[in-house]
Design a protein with these regions (language model features):
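Short, structured beta/alpha segment
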Residues: 1-90, 263
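Rossmann-like NAD(P) dinucleotide-binding subdomain of oxidoreductase/dehydrogenase enzymes
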Residues: 122-264, 392
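Long amphipathic alpha-helix in the N-terminal Rossmann-like dinucleotide-binding domain
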Residues: 49, 71-82, 96-121
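ALDH superfamily catalytic-core signature
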Residues: 229-372, 435
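Short, solvent-exposed loop/turn elements at beta->coil junctions and helix N-caps
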Residues: 129-133, 350-356, 439
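Conserved C-terminal structural/oligomerization subdomain of aldehyde/semialdehyde dehydrogenase
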Residues: 29-35, 219, 256, 309, ...
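Short, well-ordered beta-strand elements within core beta-sheets of diverse protein domains
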Residues: 32-39, 54-60, 145, 255-257, ...
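Residue-level signal for inorganic ion chemistry
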Residues: 30, 66, 88, 111, ...
Length: 476
């Protein structure tokens, strides 16, 4: 078993103030493979003190100094790329090909894109030619970064790298059920030579370290990715000290498939929602299909879902692995059973374990038809390989169904009518709209409307989240 009990504070791996062991479970076999420590208020205080002290000098570094360190970090990441993939595969059950080509690659892509954006970013500028006002963009200060288990290094890179780039210092709390990738990233940061105290890592759960971070008076900003329920608690805790809060929360993405969609739109939609075992906050979990092609679409969807293999993470291939934990597994199975009891038609998959997999948190790719938007499976975030198919007749009806949710992270639409695509995209209430299977480029903004959060991650928008804006008059 891996011994990962230490925290990274002030440039050193240190023992926790109080012993509080926590076993990390391999979701493929339900066995513990590592032990970490859950931090205390005292551990958090030490990390915050370290970051606060380091901020006094780190904030004065030049853009060129920070770029040099980030470029070194990129080189270290490239060198240890396969280690990161192995860590992600082990901690969250991601098949090795997916862990390597998608999960680990996304962290490198974000790191390199932030380096590019930083090179072109201006930290001060004159207001305009007729004004004697000058604008400064300054680091907000000490940041508390709380990241999830479903896209571990992706989210760590989206928070840690822009904080570095803008001159902030930080405390990272990765998910306690998938912490190994975050600890490996801390090793990379140390190897790259970042000054002591600029980056600190304390493991812990949400009720402990998460609460200490979000309520700490010496933390100036919290960036959190996770559930909407937890996001509400983060916001309440942060309100006492009026700290900035950036939230990327849950979603219930709609995927509108019009009759004039491209040939493989339905099959691609199935592959999309089932990827990462359905554990993506912007997954297109509601497929809305125009009635004239509904029967054909259902047949294609069921056929494609039945083709998707479920297997061990250690195997190579394009299969999906387990979901992350027993808690998530039980929640997903409960929602599948609710779909059956509420009258939806189970067209593929179901609550039983896949053939040949008698241990682990494996779930079959599951499809429901005859779904109404009032059912739990259509309203609640499932976070597993489960899709609801809903028919519609008109464009306005489809838009209304998609927008009939408290979420607003990512929505999708499929049509070969470019004018229609643009028109519908403007009507959808979400931070991202994906047309005809096209993904978002690195450096574009990612974030949600309504209860999917606030703020944006990625690119220039991601840098700006960590900056204060100062106006200076009488400049000239």
């Amino acid at each position: 078993m891996l011994d990962k009990r230490k925290f990274y504070i002030n440039g050193q791996w240190v023992d926790p103030v109080k012993k509080n062991d926590f076993e990390v479970i391999n979701p493929c076999n339900e066995d513990p493979f590592a032990v970490i420590s859950l931090g205390s208020k005292e551990d958090t205080d030490l990390a915050v003190k370290s970051a606060k002290n380091a901020f006094e000098t780190w904030k004065e570094t030049s853009k060129e100094e920070r770029l040099s360190l980030l470029e070194k970090l990129s080189s270290v990441y490239k060198k240890r790329f396969n280690e990161m993939a192995e860590a992600i595969s082990l901690e969250m059950g991601a098949p090795m090909d997916w862990a390597t080509d998608v999960q680990t690659a996304s962290g490198k892509d974000h790191l390199d894109d932030f380096i590019l954006r930083l090179k072109n970013f201006k930290f001060d500028e004159h207001f305009d030619n007729k004004s004697n006002n000058h604008i400064y963009y300054e680091p907000i200060g000490v940041c508390g970064l709380i990241t999830p288990w479903n896209w571990p290094i992706n989210q760590i890179a989206l928070k840690v790298v822009p904080a570095f780039a803008t001159g902030c210092t930080m405390i990272l709390k990765p998910s306690e059920i998938a912490p190994i990738s975050g600890m490996l990233f801390a090793e990379m940061i140390d190897e790259a030579g970042f000054p002591k105290g600029v980056f600190n890592l304390v493991n812990g759960d949400g009720a402990g370290v998460g609460t200490h971070i979000s309520s700490h008076p010496d933390i100036d900003m919290v960036s959190f990715t996770g559930s909407t329920r937890a996001g509400r608690l983060i916001s309440k805790n942060a309100a006492e000290t009026i700290k900035r809060v950036c939230l990327e929360l849950g979603g219930k993405g709609g995927n509108i498939v019009f009759a004039d969609s491209y040939k493989d739109a339905v099959r691609d939609g199935i592959r999309n929602v089932m990827s990462n075992s359905g554990q993506s906050c912007d997954a297109p979990t509601r497929m809305l299909v125009e009635k004239s092609i509904y029967e054909r679409a259902v047949k294609e969807a069921v056929d494609e879902a039945n083709k998707i293999k479920v297997d061990q993470a250690s195997k190579k291939g394009d299969h999906i692995g387990p979901v992350i934990s027993k808690i998530q597994y039980d929640k997903i199975i409960d929602l599948i059973e609710s779909g059956i009891s509420e009258g939806a038609t189970l067209a593929a998959g179901g609550p039983e374990l896949p053939n040949g997999l008698n241990k682990g948190y494996f779930i079959k790719p599951t499809i429901f038809t005859d779904v109404t938007n009032e059912m739990r499976i259509a309203k609640e975030e499932i976070f597993g390989p489960v899709l609801s198919i809903i028919p519609f007749e008109t464009e306005d009806e489809a838009v209304n169904i998609v927008n009939d949710t408290s979420y607003g992270l990512g929505n999708y639409l499929q049509t070969e009518d470019r004018e229609k695509a643009h028109r519908v995209a403007k009507k959808l209430r979400s931070g991202c709209v994906y047309i005809n299977g096209n993904g978002a480029d690195a450096g574009t903004p990612f974030g949600g409307y309504r209860q999917s959060g606030n703020g944006r991650e990625g690119g220039v928008w991601g840098l700006e989240e960590y900056l204060e804006v100062k106006n200076v008059t009488g400049w000239s």
